[in-house]
Each structure stands twice: as structure tokens, then as C-alpha cells.
Regions:
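Mature, function-bearing regions of proteins
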Residues: 1-65, 69-202
């Protein structure tokens, strides 16, 4: 409700990707500048949820939720499609390092281990809601326009892979489901696409 997400979905995704890339791999000074810019934007964003509950983008609890949902999804994808045997100690290291970015944005009590992340997500479940707006956004994402004809199939695969990575309870809340056949198509398909993408950015 506070951006041009619906009109420029790819642009919104690109800006988010640039922020994540810069704060993860960029110079400290550049990361700090981006974080301050995002914090300034957050201060201007407020509204009401569908049930009338007020919210602010700068709310520390909301910032923690967004961070944990994002990072746990990244980890789930990494474990499935890149390093299934990644040691728990390395997973914990990722969460510890990523938590610094969340804290700099204003998040509080950010979990810093895989066990703490799992506990946090479980604790948040009673507060989560799926409504018409939630389903609208999910539908928009699943039918997102591709930047080119060649990108249509890889894009569709990636979106279905996202559904496949959801915890069962989250998929049920959103009314999203992949059949066994779809999973057998999506997983090897994403492995193939990922190899091409990795080669293209080397």
C-alpha cells in the first residue's frame, strides 16, 4: 500500500535485491548509507491492517519479523539448492552476521541461531493472518511479469520453488500447494536454472 509494487514489481524487487546485496557484500560505508536511507523511508510509512490495527514500518517488532522471514527463507533455499549439508554452526554464523543489519535498521531481539529462528517463527504463528490482501499479493507474485520471453519459464519455476520452500503451515494459510508431480518438476528445474545464473554472474 505504500509503494508502486503493483505497477513496477520488477523495479521493487530490483531495489530490494540491491539493498540485500550491498549490505551483505558491499563496503561498510555503503551499507551504512543504504541503511540510513531505508530508515528514513520507514519513518514515513504507517497505516492500518485489514482488522484496523495500526502499524508503522519503523516498528522494531515488524522489522524483526521481516528480517527473520527473509533470512530463514534464504537459508531454506541455500540448504535445498546449494549446500544441503551446511553445518549448523555455519547456519548460526549466517544468522548472527545478518542480525547486525536488522539491528542497524531498528529491529530488536533478533534471533541469532537456527534454533532461535525456529523458536521465533513458531512463537509468531498465533499473530499471523491471511486475508484478501495477503492472497492478492501472493497472486501478483505468482503471476509476475517476466522482463523477457526467455525469462518466463525460469521466473515461473522460481515462484513455484518459493511455494515449495514454505513451511507447511504457511502454505496452508496462503492456500498454496504443489502436487508431488509439480515438486518433481520444480526442484530439478531450479537446480538447472541456478547453475546458469551462477555461471552468468562469475
Amino acid at each position: 500500500d505504500h509503494s508502486n509494487f503493483r505497477e513496477d514489481m520488477l523495479g521493487r524487487l530490483r531495489r530490494t535485491s540491491q539493498f540485500i546485496s550491498a549490505t551483505t557484500f558491499g563496503a561498510t560505508r555503503d551499507a551504512e548509507r543504504l541503511i540510513e536511507r531505508v530508515k528514513h523511508i520507514h519513518l514515513q510509512v504507517s497505516g492500518q491492517a485489514s482488522d484496523g490495527t495500526p502499524y508503522e514500518a519503523s516498528d522494531p517488532q515488524l522489522l524483526t519479523w521481516v528480517h527473520v522471514a527473509e533470512c530463514s527463507s534464504f537459508m531454506a533455499a541455500h540448504l535445498r539448492y546449494r549446500r544441503p549439508g551446511l553445518a549448523v554452526s555455519e547456519q548460526d554464523r549466517y544468522y548472527r552476521e545478518a542480525a547486525r543489519i536488522a539491528a542497524a535498521l531498528g529491529a530488536r531481539d533478533v534471533p541469532t541461531s537456527s534454533a532461535a529462528v525456529a523458536d521465533y517463527l513458531q512463537a509468531q504463528r498465533p499473530q499471523l493472518r491471511s486475508d484478501e490482501r495477503t492472497r492478492e499479493v501472493a497472486n501478483l507474485l505468482l503471476n509476475a511479469p517476466a522482463p523477457s520471453r526467455l525469462a518466463r519459464l525460469p521466473g515461473a519455476l522460481m515462484m513455484r520453488a518459493g511455494i515449495d520452500l514454505l513451511p507447511d503451515w504457511a502454505a496452508q494459510m496462503l492456500g498454496l500447494h504443489l502436487s508431488t508431480l509439480q515438486r518433481h518438476i520444480v526442484r530439478p528445474g531450479v537446480h538447472g536454472v541456478a547453475k546458469v545464473l551462477r555461471a552468468s554472474v562469475r
